[in-house]
Every structure is written in C-alpha cells, then in structure tokens.
C-alpha cells in the first residue's frame, strides 16, 4: 500500500498490534469502548448487544471536548442500536452494498469535511469492502480485471465469514482489493495534505481483525494472520516512527484521547496508553480470544518473543459461560519451536484462568 505508507510514514506505524477478538462485532465494540471482549460481552452472533452504559464511548469523550462528531458507516455490526450513536451529532448509515462502498465513502468523507470545515470535527468512517472476499460477493470490476481465472475460481464461502479455511485464491483477491483500496485512499490522503497542516489533524487507520483464509492449515485458529491488525496514526503530537511495541486494540481509545488532550478514566477500561504514545510502560503481551455460543473457548497471548495459547474443550453456552474441560496451555517461540519452559507456561495459565474466572461454570 504505497499511498498509505507514504501518508502514515510521517506519523507512527504500529507493527505489533493485536485485535481483542477475531471478528467484527466484538472487535469494533473494543475500539469504541476501550474494553476487551470479556469486558463488554458483545460476543453473540445472533443476539444483539449494546456498549456498556458504565463507560463513556470514544465518541462521547470527543464530543465532551467540544468537537462536532459524525459517523459514516456501512457496517451492520456497529450500528446505532448497539450504542455506536452515543455522542454522535450526525450519524449516517447505509448498507455497504447499497451506497457505502469504499469509492463512495471516501468521497462522502471529503464532502463531509468540506461541509463542516469551519468546525472542530471528529469523523469515524468505516469501509468494509474487504469483507466481500470472505462473504463470496462480487468484487469491484477494477479488482476483477487484475485477477487471473485461477484467482477468480469459485470457492465455498464457509460456514461463516469468521470460520474460513486457508485459501490461495481468496488470499490473492485480498491482496488485489487492498491495492485498489490504496489507490482510492490516495484521493483522501491527497485532499488532507492539500488542505491541512499536521498540527491541525489527527488521522488514524485501523483494521478490526485479520482473515481466516490467510491462516495456513497447520496453524492455530488464532494465529497472527487472523489476529494482527493494521494500526497507524498521523498528525498533531504524533511522533514520526515505526513502533514494534506490543499493543492491544483496547488501547485505541486511550491513544486517541491522549492525542486529543482528553482525560480517560482508566479504572473502568482494559485499554492502556502505550509507551510509544506517552504511556508509562509497554504491555508484556496482548490477548486475543474467541468466544462463541456452541464453540470451544480459546485465547492467545502474543508477546515479543513467543505466543501462548489456551484451548478449552467444553462448549460455550448462550451467555458466554463454559465449564473447564481438558484445557491445554502451550506455545511457540518466534522461530516456531515449542515452549518447554514450565514456569513460563504456568505463568500464562494463571493469567488466562484469572481472566475467565467469572465466565467458568463451576460444579
């Protein structure tokens, strides 16, 4: 993504950021609330949830600072009834396929910024076209014309967009769609640079999760291809650097509030301000977890030199609770070798057990 790199290399690009969840509904709730999945419990795929009223949302924090707040969205997993309209002065929602595709939303964003140019404004824009690959939808003609027949070959969409097996074809479609995205976003980047100085803006770009069809068949469900995400910032008070600090997506709210000079109540959230953005210390690990009714709970702790997994064998119920049954704690170093250090594994077993204690069904 040359346009994206050229734009954000003048800010901070974070290369070790991990999503708290592996799919959109809980992941976007984390970005807006600063809570991890077990904190906000918006995890159920068929029962709607709502952002907890006990914590301010990012939009509410920014609204309280005096900004005109807006949301342009085509993603049905972060709609107003889920609490994402809290703090919004203007909320524009359209089903992605009916008017909120990338090429439309980017122009909508420019139009919005122009319309409210005399105000201090905050704009959240969601572009979800990459989801079309997992969902099996037709891609833009501009993408299709760059794909071979082999890369366009029909494949089963899978049980859900989350539970995707590795696919070479989908991987190629993913890469070509990202290249198309970068071309489109270049229009927005150019507009911003022509109209604003860096001390007048704070721009962030992030992804909610990775992709299952990028995970090799011999790797864990929560491997980095599914959990590591794009995460970058540019503008006022943003240093120019590449950061390899371990960061959780729960840290997004603290980062944005720091850049906007807003005080955060850290006692109520899981997010922390990374050292790269002025925090006091680095995270030693970031946890991603998968919790679905009818599925087995699993989690991974990603650290600098290793990744450690927790796999439970009992199924999760409709309330997000489960019995502990034949669970395993194991991990791998960066070079792929097994972790045999019992003290290290015991340490993370305790960390995982403390996290899930309130969700375990005890005899």
Model segments located where?
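Catalytic domains that recognize anionic headgroups
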Residues: 1-363
């Amino acid at each position: 993504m040359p346009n994206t790199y050229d734009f954000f290399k003048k800010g901070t690009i974070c290369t070790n950021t991990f999503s708290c969840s592996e799919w959109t509904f809980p992941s976007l709730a984390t970005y807006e609330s600063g809570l991890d999945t077990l904190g906000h419990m918006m995890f159920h795929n068929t029962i709607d949830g709502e952002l907890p009223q006990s914590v301010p949302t990012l939009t509410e924090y920014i609204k309280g600072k005096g900004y005109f707040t807006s949301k342009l969205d085509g993603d049905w997993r972060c709609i107003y009834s889920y609490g994402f309209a809290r703090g919004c002065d203007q909320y524009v929602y359209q089903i992605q396929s009916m008017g909120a595709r990338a090429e439309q939303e980017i122009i909508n964003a420019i139009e919005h910024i122009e319309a409210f140019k005399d105000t201090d404004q905050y704009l959240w824009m969601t572009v979800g076209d990459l989801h079309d690959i997992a969902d099996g939808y037709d891609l833009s003609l501009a993408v299709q014309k760059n794909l071979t027949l082999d890369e366009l070959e029909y494949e089963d969409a899978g049980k859900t967009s989350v539970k995707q097996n590795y696919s070479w074809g989908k991987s190629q479609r993913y890469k070509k769609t990202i290249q198309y995205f970068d071309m489109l976003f270049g229009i927005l980047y150019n507009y911003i640079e022509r109209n604003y100085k860096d001390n007048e803006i704070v721009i962030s770009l992030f992804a909610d999760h990775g992709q299952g069809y990028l995970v090799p068949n011999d790797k864990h469900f929560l491997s980095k291809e599914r959990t590591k995400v794009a995460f970058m910032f540019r503008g006022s008070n943003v240093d120019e650097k590449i950061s390899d600090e371990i960061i959780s997506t729960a840290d997004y709210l603290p980062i944005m509030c720091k850049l906007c000079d807003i005080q955060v109540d850290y006692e109520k959230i899981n997010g922390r301000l990374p050292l790269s953005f002025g925090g006091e210390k680095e995270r030693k690990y970031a946890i991603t977890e998968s919790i679905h009714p009818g599925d087995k709970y699993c989690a991974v702790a990603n650290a600098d030199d290793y990744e450690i997994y927790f796999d439970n064998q009992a199924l999760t119920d409709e309330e997000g609770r489960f019995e502990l049954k034949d669970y395993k704690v194991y991990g791998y170093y960066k070079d792929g070798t097994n972790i045999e250090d019992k003290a290290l594994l015991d340490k993370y077993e305790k960390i995982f057990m403390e996290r899930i204690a309130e969700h375990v069904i005890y005899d």
